[in-house]
Curated annotation (Swiss-Prot):
Keywords: Chloroplast, Elongation factor, GTP-binding, Hydrolase, Magnesium, Metal-binding, Nucleotide-binding, Plastid, Protein biosynthesis
Name the UniProt record assigns to this protein: Elongation factor Tu, chloroplastic
Known function: GTP hydrolase that promotes the GTP-dependent binding of aminoacyl-tRNA to the A-site of ribosomes during protein biosynthesis.
Pfam families given in the database record: GTP_EFTU (PF00009), GTP_EFTU_D2 (PF03144), GTP_EFTU_D3 (PF03143)
Location of region: G3: 81-84
Gene of this entry: tufA
EC number(s) given by UniProt: 3.6.5.3
Organism in which the protein naturally occurs: Stigeoclonium helveticum (Green alga)
Amino acid sequence: MARAKFERKKPHVNIGTIGHVDHGKTTLTAAITMALAARGGATGRKYDEIDSAPEEKARGITINAAHVEYETENRHYAHVDCPGHADYVKNMITGAAQMDGAILVVSGADGPMPQTTEHVLLAKQVGVPAIVVFLNKADQVDDPELLELVELEVRDILDKYGFASDEVQILSGSALLALEALVENPNIKPGDSEWVDKIYNLMATVDEHIPTPKREMDKPFLLAVEDVFSITGRGTVATGRVERGTLKVNETVEIIGLRDTKTTTVTAIEMFQKTLDETIAGDNVGILLRGVQKKDIERGMVIAKPGTILPHTLFEGQVYVLTAEEGGRKSGFFKGYQPQFYVRTTDVTGKILDFSYIKQRNPSELSTMHSNPMVCPGDYVNMKIQLITPIAIEKGMRFAIREGGRTVGAGMVLEILES
């Protein structure tokens, strides 16, 4: 069956749900798709359709299982919801780099929890530009003053991590009650249910308060590979978000990082099971590659315009080391420390060869007097980093440092140190 063409009629925005486990991220995602489906702007997706990842689909290109698409009157959205917690933080570092904005879901009944803070911090680190807050489970809160207290707590967290809280819109509702009303009557009209109306109100707020991003269309094409599928009779497909530039079918690209660079031709491009002649920055797409085996390409590589980015292992980075309160280490570390470096969609072990202080949290501590200086939680430092595997990196790129399931630091590449 021939695939329909994707028609670009509205601006495309990538959005995601973030927040503490069990505060209702996936329920809210389901409620949004079903509410917009009632107005013809989406295919309704029930909770279990979002929460269970369909395995590779032999018939077509499946973009990462947690992506759903929907439309409001003004925009086309791709929505990412990553339910599992351990993967969530990992996906936030790789996936949040793809968000143009986020809906922070906080249970009005429970208030902010440790992961609420962690996700706000991560959103800031990876450059999510705007947040709208949804206080969920409002039906379980009898006293409106309690919701106001939760709102104040959330604003404090947003302020602490550099989101101007007085500009952030905070709405309340019940994703579950909205979803139940929509399951009972999929053709519900605005005005029929206060809970469904609160979902419409949320999306109107997202339309207005999460700015349409300025895409880097004039830069050379680059896509970080998120997933790879092999489609019988068609070849190998790499999926991911176009970080910058544009790409047309039949153009030549390079596959860079983790192993030797390979050159190939693009034979097809698809988005949400529709074909494209050209993909542009911001799209979540699948790219069919000529003559590439599934074993030749993996998550963490990049597909780019030939000659525009190179793989490297040695660079200098500027890093903020998280405190224990921010979810980081309790103790400091020395030269020779070997954590994981998360860059785009990949994580690679690296060694900290050297460092110099930019700003210390407690400069009077013995750390500087010691013959073997130590990096302490809360410090800002410049680091010289050696990765064990070459990956596509460039000046100005952000990365996260993780160890044993926790984020240790957040940084930016200052300089590539080898040819």
